Amino acid sequence: MELTEKDAAALVKEGLLCVEFGEYDEAIENYDKALKIIETAEIYLNKGDLFVETELFQEAIQCYDKAIELDPNDSLIWYNKGVVLTDIEKLDEAIQCYDKAIELESDYSDAWYNKAELLKHKGLEKEATICFEKVKELERN
């Protein structure tokens, strides 16, 4: 019997439930089974998020990269990759990811905020202030 996209969606939902209950290995199995049926950015995003939760940052980046390959216009994927790169102190790469998330979704206040924090950390006060001002503007609206 050939598995369908519906089966893949069910496996992803099961994987998400496994994550909620801390059954990470089983979640990975479900995501991998789903990926054998159909490769989607969403599945790679979920798998990447799980790797972040378990502090497997390089694996998370690989999943986000694959998700970006499949859907380069998803701002959440770029944002999540930026967060991981921040965690492993690859600040310039993280800023590039936040920039891409902002390019795709100009009102993405979390991306603006994280970019501002990194710019501040790098001593780029003027650029950081511009980003913080954008966050304030977005939060007011």
Give residue spans per PLM region:
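Conserved structural position within tetratricopeptide repeats
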Residues: E2, K33-K36, D65-E69, D99-E103, ...
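Short coil turns that delineate tetratricopeptide repeat
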Residues: E5, I38-E39, P72, S106, ...
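Helix-start (N-cap) detector for alpha-helical repeat units in TPR-like alpha-solenoids
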Residues: A8, A41-I43, S75-L76, S109-D110
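Register position in tetratricopeptide repeats
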Residues: E20, E53-T54, D87-I88, H121
